[in-house]
């Protein structure tokens, strides 16, 4: 990381940034395009003793699922806390932010695991109350677990 003064190296602080974000972009290898296929997804984070998992959901068909079946290695990025900062005296501006990026392996979850993944995802958006969802909706949803293998974070704060 070029700007070491903005690096967030503490895992707990990195996970707090993840919890403040409301969407996650996933880059999937697309060999037909010689470029990544990028999608923005809702997510939930589970911090376990030996690993961290991002849970995401999707329709049960489509380009994303086809590509993940070919190569489950993905990169991810999320950011939050965006605030334009304008310095009138210097007539310059910058942006405050927090961001996390990394890579890992996506795995399609079994039906039982998928229900847990959906619970974690719902807890991310509704942390103080359980929001039930119809079993039919859960049955028609593909749920993936992204095991994070590497993650970095940075932020620019108000001075």
Regions found by a protein language model. Give the residues of each.
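A generic structural signal for nonpolar/aromatic side chains embedded in well-ordered alpha-helices
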Residues: 18, 67-68, 121
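Charged, gly/pro-rich active-site loop segments
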Residues: 1-8, 81-159
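Short, basic/aromatic recognition patches
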Residues: 1-25
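Conserved hydrophobic/aromatic beta-strand scaffold that supports enzyme active sites
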Residues: 17, 25, 38, 143-145, ...
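Structural motif corresponding to alpha-helix initiation and N-cap regions
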Residues: 11, 61-62
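Broad gene-expression machinery/nucleic-acid interaction feature
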Residues: 23, 38-40, 73, 97, ...
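Short beta-strand segments
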Residues: 21-60, 76
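Helix-adjacent hinge/juxtasegments
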Residues: 63-86, 93
């Amino acid at each position: 990381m070029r700007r070491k003064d903005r690096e967030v190296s503490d895992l707990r602080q990195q996970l707090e940034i993840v919890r403040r974000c409301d969407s996650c972009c996933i880059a999937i290898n697309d060999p037909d395009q010689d470029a990544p296929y990028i999608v923005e997804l809702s997510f939930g984070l589970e911090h376990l003793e030996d690993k961290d998992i991002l849970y995401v959901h999707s329709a049960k068909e489509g380009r994303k699922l086809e590509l993940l079946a070919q190569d489950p290695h993905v990169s991810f990025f999320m950011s939050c806390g965006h605030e334009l900062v304008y310095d009138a005296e210097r007539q310059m501006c910058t942006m405050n932010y927090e961001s996390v990026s990394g890579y890992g392996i996506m795995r399609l979850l079994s039906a039982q695991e998928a229900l847990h993944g959906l619970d974690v995802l719902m807890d991310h958006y509704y942390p103080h109350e359980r929001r039930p969802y119809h079993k039919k909706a859960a049955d028609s949803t593909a749920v993936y677990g992204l095991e994070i293998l590497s993650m970095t974070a940075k932020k620019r704060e108000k001075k």
